Amino acid sequence: TRAVPMTYAFDFASVLSSWPQFLEGAWMTILLSFPATVIGFVGGTLLAIGRRSDKRWLVNACGAYVEVLRNTPLLVQVFLVCFGLASLGWKVSAFSAALLSLVINVAAYSCEIMRAGMDSIHKGQIEAAECLGLTRRQVYWHVVIRPAMEKVYPALTSQFVLLMLASSITSQ
């Protein structure tokens, strides 16, 4: 048999004619991804602090949240938020449901990333800060969270890129 050469020509006219839809999609990606990243990161950091708590019930509650959300697909979470809130009688716009789904998802992943960063801080540094008279809040901010954020920056950046890509799941 003879090989037949393939000649493909991409028609950019169809892309250019759909340019407004591409721009609208890019804008919606930004509108969903940026707030979900910020709110999810703050929530994940609070969850990570909760997972390191002395209170057993708080550790278990935060751990259960993280494990459930990390072990269910994002699409299932989106369906649960959209249809679950509606079945409870709460009227939520599609945008709000999508944003809430992304926030609760990225918070669970950010929690584990931040917890790993916090656990990497040597206990001696925390004890030294306490001996210097820093309050618990000051110790967490200056000695634990800020250095942990520097250590986990690459992992957090990757997670936020994945969030931006996953925002396409929420399209209508």
Predicted regions and their residues:
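Transmembrane alpha-helices and adjacent helix-loop boundaries
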Residues: 3-172
